[in-house]
């Protein structure tokens, strides 16, 4: 295998136009036997693989696709059987679970594709797809245990971030505002809390012992049976938008589940509202008590009278713990958490700007950075800080305090206002911000690892949706967006592999983007579903009757009104650009061959031009007054014709005189010397 890869890489540089077809013929008995044995063992040796590969030269892309296909099946490619002894085999129980709709196999643990990537040539390439695939191949796939470990890190990071938010008085202030909005009816409960998580209670987030291994295995088998049953009922053919729902259900079942979901949300909201309102009221009452102690603490630090008494400190800690417990029990909506984090970061940014301004001012007088930080930290709210720095003997301090006293007081007043706004000391605020940033950073890093390890899954799904109006890179991008949503929603305690769960999110993201972006004139998703249903049925009937079905036959087959079928078929037609090149030389466009109903035929245009020229010559043979009267009466060379009265006003004569001039001019035109020139136009 290694020799074949090297030979094919050299051959690839000589012929760029090689075709990329599948290397393994899955209908061949030898290939079937090899794959069956490899699935049972979890690996295949290179010698075994070489024995079933075709003898003709192939491209490195074909070998890469073959390695990826085997990896998707859960088969590792190794040099020899001795190398497999060090690597644990995949659990057989996950192999069925990895299979998704349409017979597609989702990636599982293994490093086959990463091994294949190492065998690729290291020459530079400008192709963005190849660069993306090469970078993607450097990340190893995750096993089930690896997915659980990363999911736990995401959960721990989120827990750290929420714990930090729960210690911020800004969170309690926001909760009180949200409670008032709920009472006023301006906000829905589902916009503030995560209904499903709050409804399921602590058991939903508890340790795995709340779900026994037997329960997890039973759920997994039930899901597999449901998937197999659905796949048997599904029609054959390409996958369409109608095949993919939010939960991987057929359209009919998905619609029913959507109704049930909407009903359940309303029911959960009605059931949880009293409990949530009671919790919010408790938070409001407890926070009022805590706020009094916080104000006393800040005032004590500003007045340099020390801190709270031991009893007050103990009471402060008790109230704080009660608030944190109450807030965590709410399971806030992610959008609300993001708004709280953004508010916290905004105040932190303003604090850093003021402190940075003060530091730069001190450094301009020669104060060393370390010396400034030593004197400043811990004394942010000390009203006697100006006096203390004036007495310092270190370089620059006295000049700094003397020359910039007004600016220093102004900056420190702004910092004090921020402390009052947050309700806690600056040091405590910094600790909370650091805690939130740490949790957010850990969760983000873990999510990034999970996403990068499953990029192959997006590629394998996106390949099925090419030639549908979007570029391959656009499909990958939309699939990656779905993958990131799947990472956010993944619940590892349910016992399923991440690939099984993420497949539906990726497919829905891709199919929805095709429906929204692929057409020049956007068609609603529900109409796209109807179009795909008719197209699929038409393709099926084509195989049955040997010709394209008529609209009447489609309407009868689908039990649809004939007018609706005709309307859908009309909408389904793709628009084509009038600038489409025509011919080999591409010197003309499609629009050049479309008849313009409003344009004159060339012969008619020539006749009209000749008539205009002849009429002008004939009229010129009359007197100027007669010519002008005829032109005005018949609108020749003018925007409109004129009445006898209007012409008379122009010449300051009566209408009767104009009638006489007109009659005389017409008699002159009827003379054979003039009428002969115009009679030919009348005959034509």
Swiss-Prot record:
Biased composition (Basic and acidic residues): 1-18, 117-129, 214-228
Domain of life of the source: Bacteria
GO MF entry, a single one: sigma factor activity
Intracellular or extracellular location(s): Cytoplasm
Renumbered residue ranges of the record's region Sigma-70 factor domain-3: 529-605
GO biological process: DNA-templated transcription initiation
Record region (Disordered): 1-25, 83-129, 203-262
Gene3D superfamilies (UniProt xref): RNA Polymerase Primary Sigma Factor (1.10.601.10), Sigma-70 factor, region 1.1 (1.10.220.120), Winged helix-like DNA-binding domain superfamily/Winged helix DNA-binding domain (1.10.10.10)
Pfam family name, one: Sigma70_r1_2
Chief location: cytoplasm
Biased composition (Acidic residues): 83-102, 250-261
Tagged with keyword DNA-binding: yes
Record key words, sorted: Cytoplasm, DNA-binding, Sigma factor, Transcription, Transcription regulation
Transit peptide among keywords: no
Residue ranges for the DNA-binding region feature of this UniProt entry: 644-663
Region annotation Sigma-70 factor domain-4: where it falls in the sequence: 618-671
Motif residue range(s): Interaction with polymerase core subunit RpoC: 474-477
GO cellular component: cytoplasm
Location of region: Sigma-70 factor domain-2: 450-520
Assigned protein family: Belongs to the sigma-70 factor family. RpoD/SigA subfamily.
Entry function: Sigma factors are initiation factors that promote the attachment of RNA polymerase to specific initiation sites and are then released. This sigma factor is the primary sigma factor during exponential growth.
Subunit structure: Interacts transiently with the RNA polymerase catalytic core.
Protein's name in the database: RNA polymerase sigma factor RpoD
UniProt lineage: Bacteria, Pseudomonadati, Pseudomonadota, Alphaproteobacteria, Hyphomicrobiales
Gene that this polypeptide is encoded by: rpoD
